[in-house]
């Protein structure tokens, strides 16, 4: 079989992934019998067979693609399926000895930092400089730290040394933009930002801590150029299949080029209408250069409403003189207020499903920016009508779950000097949560201590003390006999557990992770019969706690007098209470068939989901957020694109990029809907301002919903 690499290019839902799977099947069939080839590949120098390296744009796509490839060849050939960042992370950790040898670092196993931990440690490290040089309101400090850390990630993904970030900022952005976005009033803004980044990177490497930005830089700058590592790549893999390369970082192109240089059989797919992660860490135009080294396989199939109506839609939003009307497949749903729009949208979905026009799983509600009010309102109304909703990548703060709040309050009672983190209202909530032991006729957990009784107990039986808060005996409450036997028994059981655990902790210095695990097993009945969202929150809490104390242990190795254990627990509790950690643990549902439900998400989430539906509801259709990147665009991302280095990013360039993004978004969404688009418009937005975005012309050109 020819080893000429293949470049599969086509629009949304044109069959690119299917074609990639087909090429993989043909390649495997063309190889010697898989069992024989696997045995021949085994030797003393290479104990494992060379596998195929497969890339996918995100974790959801990765799992689906891995399943398709395995089914295509009935598991007869080994594959390694990763996202680009996942692969780089694994490689940096696997070949860490090569890195610390070249950098002269301490020989210690690296620890990957989660974004929230990275934020916390960087804020602490930069606090003196922020106070001295940067005039920031406290409310903007979080955003400032996040944006500076994102600069390191953008630079690493594009192959720019951290030392050059200040230069890129100075050349690529105006002083006005820097001051406006970063809220800095110093003349040497880029230099000071660069100093913060270098300080953070060096501090992290000394302690073996790896953030995403540091991982990117370590890979392209130190690991990938190492000839010993390159030899290992050649020994481990014999081909590469990369799906949706328009969502890959620039340094991925260098890796893929390396495989092409060594005549690896390679297949790539590229979507000109995609570029979903452009503005984050992706550099699709740079990746497209790989096409010049490949045999081009164009796919011209256009799916959904895009086949007939994409040009009409684009003409309406771009040409002010275009006076056409939209066909019957487009319907406008208009109200005055946003609240009314949410109710009317939910009602329209309920009516359509109840009347049998469309099934719930055939509907997607897509918004440019889905705020919590809209998410909650739509989910409450639809689920109340018996229509399930599947929110895409829902990331509610962990602290929004009452079980998590109760467990954090429990830590404040077991460990000393944490009384300020256990107010009376938190104690009352904890008593309610830990007394859920009865079931009603509808199989709902009923607490033995209801909120009223819990409030009375917290008022009379809780001893507030900053150093040693305690739950007193139930008879401390003069009218304890009015509480009832069930409430008193449940309260005494909780008190007995807390006092026993406190005694064990004082004797054996128990880790908070052990205390949390014991509380989940004994006070929450090991999570038995809890709904999935609560189980996910508990799993994420334990994963977060494990990660937090691993990092704490590493910091204590470098700084023995780092801080007291109570201060560490206090920081952990406050970190979660700030709401920066969400319930998004490693997925457990990938083998469970999802129930029929309405899909709900923002534009970025829906496009990344790479699905399609019969009906689309485009929420807030006239919002200006449709033509803006919003949260899917990081600050200063364009100045790190490989195709436009050292070009100043101007307002005109930003407007041009916004228009190009809007056209890609509309073409992409229209290809993902097959029957009807309901354009949901309210005259007033969330903030009460008029909604006059570019898609208003679509609303005006469509027939109104009856």
Regions of interest found by a model, annotated:
Residues 12-32, 303-385:
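Helicase P-loop NTPase motor core
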Residues 357-362, 367-499:
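ATPase/helicase motor core of nucleic-acid motors
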Residues 5-8, 125-240, 330-336:
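Accessory N-terminal region flanking or inserted into the helicase ATPase core
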Residues 190-191, 468-602:
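Accessory C-terminal helicase-associated subdomains
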Residues 619-701:
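C-terminal accessory regions
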Residues 83-87, 240-246, 540-544, 550-561, ...:
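Conserved helicase core region in the C-terminal RecA-like lobe
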Residues 48-160, 164:
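Conserved P-loop NTPase-based nucleic-acid remodeling module centered on helicase motor cores
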Residues 182-291, 298-305, 313, 337-338, ...:
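Conserved helicase NTPase motor core
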